[in-house]
């Protein structure tokens, strides 16, 4: 396809199956970038200029009730392609929020599922909203809802599949979530360092997943910071990211 001119550099390569947490996604800039790609069915997408990545969670009951959560903003680690921070609510205009949430509802209804579905989107430099991926399950982008929303995504999922009235999707307060992942060059029995330095900070809510072993970039937990000042919450999240170390026992 490249030799025929049907695909040009740069582009995004995605494995058709078994992609998660940044795995199975690569930015390809030249022929050298093709050398280490997996030999599998794949999707190739044009690399576009974007200014933000967004997510909207939608809940659907069998009886037809549908509710969306307010749109959130996702910030990704440039090296691992993993979500690093979630900002709730997204720092975009009200017009764009309405547009994103309406689009997510339309997409969710077309899947005809019962449960919850996260619709991930790109916000382009021209303020276009494009669908990136969908995930029909509880999603990392809404883990903050445990503390930050009237109804967590996990409770909402149970309400939806049991065909119970859906809970309020309104946010309780501004939140920033930071993912905790395994350090580079660390593989083995996990050890968490410096938690004592952050658990006393007001508004900090840690969640450890109980995984026995760590490896580079493996999601081991997350921390949600609740604060009326979302910029302050983001600064605290960055401090936590620099302080907490997830490594292996010596």
Feature roles, as predicted:
Residues 1-25, 31:
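A conserved helix-loop-beta module that forms one wall/lid of the active-site cleft
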Residues 7-8, 124-130, 217-219:
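A short, glycine/Asx- and small/polar-enriched loop/turn
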Residues 10-13, 42-45, 117-118, 165-167, ...:
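A short linear hydrophobic-aromatic micro-motif
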Residues 24-126:
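Internal nucleotide-binding/catalytic subdomain
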Residues 80-90, 133-146:
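Short, flexible active-site loops
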Residues 98-119, 125, 135-187:
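Active-site "cap" helix and flanking loop/linker of ATP-utilizing ligase/carboxylase catalytic domains
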Residues 159-250:
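Peripheral (often C-terminal) accessory segments that flank ATP-dependent C-N-forming ligase machineries
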């Amino acid at each position: 396809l490249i030799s025929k001119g049907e695909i040009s550099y740069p582009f995004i390569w995605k494995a058709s199956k078994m992609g998660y947490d940044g795995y199975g996604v690569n930015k390809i800039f030249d022929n050298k970038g093709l050398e280490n790609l997996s030999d599998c069915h794949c999707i190739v997408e044009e690399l576009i200029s974007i200014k933000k990545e967004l997510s909207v969670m939608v809940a659907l009951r069998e009886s037809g009730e549908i509710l969306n959560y307010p749109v959130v903003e996702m910030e990704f680690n440039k090296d691992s392609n993993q979500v690093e921070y979630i900002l709730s609510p997204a720092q975009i205009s009200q017009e764009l929020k309405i547009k994103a949430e309406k689009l997510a509802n339309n997409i969710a209804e077309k899947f005809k599922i019962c449960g919850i579905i996260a619709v991930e989107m790109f916000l382009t430099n021209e303020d276009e909203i494009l669908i990136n991926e969908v995930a029909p399950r509880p999603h990392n982008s809404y883990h903050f809802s445990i503390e930050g929303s009237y109804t967590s995504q996990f409770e909402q999922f149970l309400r939806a599949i049991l065909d119970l009235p859906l809970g309020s999707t309104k946010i309780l307060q501004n939140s920033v979530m930071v993912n905790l992942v395994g350090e580079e060059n660390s593989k083995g029995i996990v050890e968490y360092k410096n938690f004592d330095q952050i658990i006393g900070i007001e508004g900090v809510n840690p969640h450890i997943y109980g995984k026995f072993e760590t490896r580079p970039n493996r999601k081991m937990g997350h921390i949600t910071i609740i604060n009326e000042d979302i910029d302050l919450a983001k600064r605290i999240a960055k401090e936590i990211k620099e302080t907490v170390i997830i490594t292996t026992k010596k």
